[in-house]
Amino acid sequence: MSLKKELSGRRSVQAKVEAPGSTQSAVERRSAEAELRTLIAKFAPAHLGLIVAMRRWLRKRLPTACEVVYEYRDWFVISYSPNEHGYEGVLGIRASADGVKLFFNRCKELPDPAKLLQGSGNQCRSINLEGASTLARLEVARLTRCAADGCCRRRASGRGPLVPRPGP
C-alpha cells in the first residue's frame, strides 16, 4: 500500500492512503481473463457454462470483491475476497473434471438449517452444484448472503479485480 504524506504546517502531518488494486486496466483484465480461460480448459472444460453462471451470480452479490484465481492439484479455485489474498475469501468456486463446488469459508459461523453444506472441515465446507439451478434455491441464496455480510465492503464502488496467482 502506498502512503503519501503531505506536510500541512510544522506540527501536523496528514496521510493519504490509496487502496491497492482499486482499479484494473482493461489490458490487465483481459490478460487475467485469458489465464482463467486457460485454467478452465485445463481442469474443467465440460463445466464452462456453469462456471460462467456462477461467476456472474457471485459477482452480483459481491461486486467489489477480488476474484483471486489459483490452481491446486487437479482443480482450480476462484476465491471471492475483500483483498488480493485468496485465503481471506468468504466464498469460492472450486472446479475440476469431477464437478463444480461452491465453497464457504468460516462455515462454522453460518446457519445451515437445510444441511446443505457438505464436508467435515472446521474452516471450509461446500455445496456440490449439478447446474445453475442449484444457485436459484432459496437456501443457497440465504447461505451466500450470510457468508457475504460484512465481506468486501471496504471499497465503496467499482468492480473488484481478477487476480491470477501462479500455480505450484
Predicted features, each with a name:
Residues 1-168:
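Charge-dense, helix-prone N-terminal extensions
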